[in-house]
Each structure stands twice: as C-alpha cells, then as structure tokens.
Amino acid sequence: MENKRNFFITIALSILILALWQVFYLGPKTEAQREQARIEEQQRQAQQAAQNRQASSSTGDTPQMPANPDSIPGQGDTKAAGAPLTRDAAIAQSPRIEIDTPSLRGSINLTGARLDDLYLKKYHETVSDKSPEIELLAPSSLKQGYFVELGFTGNDATGAVPGPNTVWVVEGNNKLTPSTPVTLTYTNDKNLTFKRVISVDDAYMFTVDDTIINNGGSTVSLASYGRVTRFNQPEHASATYVLHEGLIGVMGQDGLQEIKYAKIEDNKDISFKDVIGGWVGITDKYWAATLIPPQDEKFTGRFSHFTNDRPRYQSDLLSAPLTVAPGQSQKIQNRVFAGAKVVNTIQNYETKYHIKQFDLLIDWGWFYFITKPMFYLIDWIYKFTGNFGVAILVVTVLLKALFFPLANKSYKSMARMKLMQPKMTEIREKYADDKMKQQQAMMELYKREKINPLAGCWPVLVQIPVFFALYKVLYVTIEMRHAPFFGWIQDLAAPDPTSIFNLFGLLPYTVPHFLMIGVWPIIMGIIMFLQMRMNPTPPDPTQAAIFTWMPIIFTFMLASFPAGLVIYWAWNNTLSIIQQSVIMKRQGVKIELFDNLKGLFRRKPKEANK
C-alpha cells in the first residue's frame, strides 16, 4: 500500500504539472496561433475596407435616438490617413484643458470633451523611477489611440447635440484638479444648452454632471451615451488564459462579461438591453478605463468591433431617453474610472458609489474565494513588515498553522505506516501468490493500526488551490508590481532575473529566455529534492524515476514564474520538511533523508568477474 500512496502522490503532482503546462505553455501557444490568424484576417478586412470605404462613418459606432446602440455617433475625425503623428503633435491639434492630480496628469480634448491624454504619475514602465510614466490614454489620431467620451444622441427636434466633433466652451477655471472642477458649455441652434461639470478625486475617478436646459419652444427627447474606444490591440496584450485583457463590464442580472479582443472580432457586436446596475470598459493587466452610469437607471450596454480604417474596439452604453419640456432642465451623472486597478481603491469605489461588482474589474480567477482573502491577508501583514516578500513568508507560516491538523494527521499516518513496514512485508511474502488475500490482510492491518494509506496525498492536494491563488495574487494585483524582496529580487511579480547559465551575471552574455534558471528556482529545486528524499525510494522503477526527475522538472517550470511564487514554494517545502521530521521523530520513525543522501554518493560495489 506504500506503493499506492506514492502512486497517488505521483498522480497529484503529474496533474499539477499538466495543468501548469496547459496554462503556461499550450495556452499561450494556441493563443499565439489565433493571434496570427486574427492579424491576417484584419489585413484582409482592411484591404476590403480601403476599397469600399465611405466618406462618413457616422452610423453604428456611437449610440442616436431612439435608444439603440447603433445610434451612437461615429468616432469623429481621427486624421489617421496621413503621415504618423507624434503624441505632442496630436495633442496640439485641438484646444484642451489641463488635468493635474496627485495620481494623474494629462488633458481633456475640448473637441468632444474627450478624455484622451492621461498619464499615471505613480507608475513607471520599469522598476526605475526615472523610466517613463505609464501612458494610459492617447488621442485617436495615434496608432494606439485610446479614449473615453460622453455625449448625447438626438433627432431633428433636438438639433445638433454634443458629440465627437462638438467644440465645448470653457467657463471659468481651465485646469482640472481635485479642488477645482471645470465647467464646459455648448448651446445649439434649437436653444438647448448643455452644461457639463467635470470633477476628479485624488485617485482615478472622474465625475461628469450634465445638465440639459431647454430654452426652446417644444419638448425634446434625447439620450446620453458613453464609450471607451481603443484603436488596435495593445502591444502588451496577454496571450495566456490566466488573465483577462480586453473588453469588460457588468450587465445587471447577466453579471460579469469578459470579452477578449479575438472574441469580439468574431462576434462584432454583443449587446445587453434594459440593464440596471453595472458598468462597461476596457481593461489591461494593471490599468483600466471604465464608464459607470447611474446604478438605479436602465441603460443598454454593448461591446463591438469596427474595421473602417483600422481595428477599433469599443465598450459603450446608452441611457434611456430623457425628456425635457420648454423652460425645464434634466440632469444626468456619469462616472469615469481611468487609472490603476489598486485593490483597496476599487473596493472603496464600489462601496462609496454602490457600483455593482466593481471589484471584478480585477481578474481574481477561479479561486476568487481564496485569492481575494489571501491578498487582503498579505496586504495586512505588509503594513507591519513593509515588504511584500516577507509578508508572503509570514502568510505561508499562517497557512501551515491553519492546515496543521490535516498535515499532522497525514504525517502521523505515514509514520505509523513506516513502522508497519515489517508486517506489510510479511503479508506480501505470505500471500505472494494470492493478491486478493494479500489486499484483505493489508486492509485488516490498516484498520487495526488505524492507518490511512492515502493520508500522504492531502498535504500535496491542499497546496494546489493555494498555489494557484497565490500565483493569481502575484500576477494580477498591481500592489505586487515592482515590489522588491531582498538582494537581486526587485520585482516579486517578475521571474528571478539571474541565470546559472551565465554564472548569475558573471559571464558577459545574455541567456535565452528558456535558460533563465535563477537562484531562487535552484534553491526551490534543491529543497524539493530534499523533501522527496524524506521517504524511502519507491521500489517501482517508474515511480522512482518520476520522484527523481520531479525536482528538476519543477525547477525549469517555475523558473519563468514570478519570483514571489518560487520563494513561497521553497519556503513552504522547507516548513514541510521540518514538520515531517518532527512528527516522524516523535513517532519513533527513522528519517530516511540522510541515508538516501548517503546512498546517492556511496560507491556501488563492482560486480564480481565471472
């Protein structure tokens, strides 16, 4: 039965390897193939569009009356057909008002009142504070144009309502800060006046208060629209199934919607009508831009893809019709989140503004119920330690304490099984020719001695969801981005940057990515090797080979994982070795580690010459 226990442990580890292989190798490979097919299809569509392009693209991509997503106005003049523009040249094409907050800098384009120029002050492209700040939004005339826009759709009775080409007029203050909102106005030929007040907090939430004043002689009906538009896929778009990057939103009772770029290219248009409570946007790994309508009013949400002159991805929403009588006014408030997906900030916005499931803007994954609490625990401990790496080590100890009863019971059962090895050997020899009686005798022995032959599997199986949950925390939470540990580990969310194949930087050449086997993966592999040697070598040659090669396989596999995860795995295995050693010693069971290590280096006797 000892062999069966080893067999089940082998199966559990094999399943883990296959799962990791699927997620981190086959998944990206398949996604890359799909990406190549997508690019080829885009090129074909672009050629076709160039031959059949119409002078105007005013139908289909911005919500008009009646309240139908197809009524949204076109994206306006992007001036993308000419020579490529620099960012400064694109920004200089239209009048703007400056944005300056503790977290953001940029400007609002007065043409369309677009938020299309935004940098994140607190985040840089690399671990160096001297590297460029993260660029979130960019003018539509650039190749990677990315903007947020709020406007209105109307009809003949309303006249021209604010849209992508409307030039707003600034009243008073012309710099947006947390303490100084800005006011924009526009009056059309039907005596409708639109007054927009834009405010921003210290973090990443913009509040847009629109007032429609009817100074005309007839009742009018119009609707408010909003959209987040991105031209071309981002260069950093993830090719794995571990993380969602693309269009995203919560659609009332339909819940969370995650639409990858490739999916919306296939479907072109995905709509949800009569939604109450939710939001729409586009998300990256660490950043996002979203539109948040009034949570107690109906809206229509839509995800779409256009190929008029270049690929364009869009998340938009359209309010229910607003009726404004002569001499009366109507108000509507929308919010725009544009910034870093800081966990506590997102959670506070959800609570403060009652935004439905806004916390799902962060991709917590399948093990949401483990991943999110684990992050909060790590974050809480970080407040005391000041180092996320140390916090992970402390959390590992706490997890060991939490699962101690289960692990303790398992190790005790394993220790008792080792004490029973002589009796088990006796049974095998006694019933060598009768497997049925051998199994019956074994089961009676287990029952009499209160041994669970599968107990050793539990410590391994319990680690699997914890492993994936911690990986998710390290991979998706911005708090872990560029978080240092000690020494050469300056980013826990990135792989160990060293490699044994250039002697950890002593040799002056760059090592290929697949040979980046750093210090911590090697430490993890050695500790895993020692853990495997805590038990006798399985008599079955196949199992023995698997147990021998398992640490080497894991060393290569985990080398490309976040350093924080490798450190966790090494520390967790170290604690397991200590725990197992103490329990075995208390049970009077011999620890096989040292004998197994001696056996590796002991010179085998030469066979006698025949």
Curated annotation (Swiss-Prot):
Gene3D superfamilies: 2.70.98.90
UniProt source species: Brucella melitensis biotype 1 (strain ATCC 23456 / CCUG 17765 / NCTC 10094 / 16M)
Record note on quaternary structure: Interacts with the Sec translocase complex via SecD. Specifically interacts with transmembrane segments of nascent integral membrane proteins during membrane integration.
UniProt KW GTP-binding keyword: no
Protein name stated in the entry: Membrane protein insertase YidC
NCBIfam families: PRK01318.1-4, yidC_nterm, yidC_oxa1_cterm
Residues that span the membrane, as ranges: 7-27, 358-378, 387-407, 458-478, 510-530, 546-566
Role summary: Required for the insertion and/or proper folding and/or complex formation of integral membrane proteins into the membrane. Involved in integration of membrane proteins that insert both dependently and independently of the Sec translocase complex, as well as at least some lipoproteins. Aids folding of multispanning membrane proteins.
Skewed-composition ranges (Low complexity): 44-55
Membrane topology designation: Multi-pass membrane protein
Domain of life where this protein originates: Bacteria
GO molecular function: membrane insertase activity
Compartment(s): Cell inner membrane
Keyword Cell inner membrane included in the entry's annotation: yes
Family the UniProt entry places it in: Belongs to the OXA1/ALB3/YidC family. Type 1 subfamily.
Keyword terms, alphabetized: Cell inner membrane, Cell membrane, Chaperone, Membrane, Protein transport, Transmembrane, Transmembrane helix, Transport
Region (Disordered): 36-82
Entry's Gene Ontology cellular component terms: plasma membrane
UniProt GO BP: protein insertion into membrane; protein transport
